[in-house]
Amino acid sequence: MNDFEMNIDNDLDLFSGHYYLIKHLTLITGLTDRTIRNYLTMGILQGEKINGLWHFTPEQVEEFLRHPAVHPSILAKHNALIYDFLAESKKPAAQMCMVLDLPDVDKKAVAQFFCYRINHGDFHQIHFSFDAVGTMARVILKGDPTEVMTLINEYYQQSNINNSL
């Protein structure tokens, strides 16, 4: 099972542009459910509770991600994937850590692709991080080399298909 597990509901799909849930934010940010709920309590994250679940518009999520109290925490979580990979001297199996910087791309489309594929593909030994750095999307993948390379290859195949249309 991957670290950031998300089951996308049909009526509140991450890719529909309507709402994000807390579980979506944990996947995107790497922050824990509890940390995100603390940001809600502090008023840093705004949302609406519907049927017992917090819902956030894309605008609310973007404002949250850009908040000066939140962004450093997210960056620390993302960078921890790389630091942990380098610091771990005894690995139980082969592992790979890849940082993919994609300048001048549709950042939302990149995030959606990786979130969707990780949650709907056969990826069980992979850790994922995404950040938008200026005009660049940054994807960090860590885990089983076969899974990491498969996911990267799928992204480039999809990217080539979309660019040729």
Residue ranges of each PLM-predicted region?
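N-terminal export/ancillary region detector
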Residues: 2-5
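Polyanion-binding surface elements
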Residues: 9-31
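A generic structural signal for beta-strand entry/edge sites
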Residues: 17-19, 53, 134-138
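Major-groove DNA-recognition helix of helix-turn-helix-type DNA-binding domains
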Residues: 29-53
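Short helix-start
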Residues: 48-68
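A short, Lys/Arg-enriched interface patch at domain edges and termini
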Residues: 61-90
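Mid-protein regulatory/catalytic core that forms ligand/cofactor-binding pockets
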Residues: 88-165
